[in-house]
């Protein structure tokens, strides 16, 4: 089964370019998805990546890579990965819904002020 890494290009603590290079070096065959992962709270303070739908975070990129290596050595459970994938999708959906509502609210405020 191919590994999958999800990394954020928006969070303050994540250096997307260097993290992507390190992950590619670790597993050249892995799928890497870059974009908002709706993991903003931890992403402000720690660098993180989702490894096969499991979130991993650390204070430094090197510490994170150690955790990623350990995670890749563990046996994979397809049912658990599917459960985590669904949870991640739901988290992203909720964030998108919140963002949409906030934009609508701001647009209404602009209309009432005009």
Swiss-Prot record:
Protein name: UPF0741 protein Sca_0247
InterPro entries registered for this protein in UniProt: DUF1450, UPF0741
Ranges in a coiled coil: 78-114
Database matches in HAMAP family: UPF0741
Record family assignment: Belongs to the UPF0741 family.
Bias type Basic and acidic residues, positions: 67-105
Keyword Coiled coil listed: yes
Domain of life per record: Bacteria
UniProt organism field: Staphylococcus carnosus (strain TM300)
Keywords noted in UniProt: Coiled coil
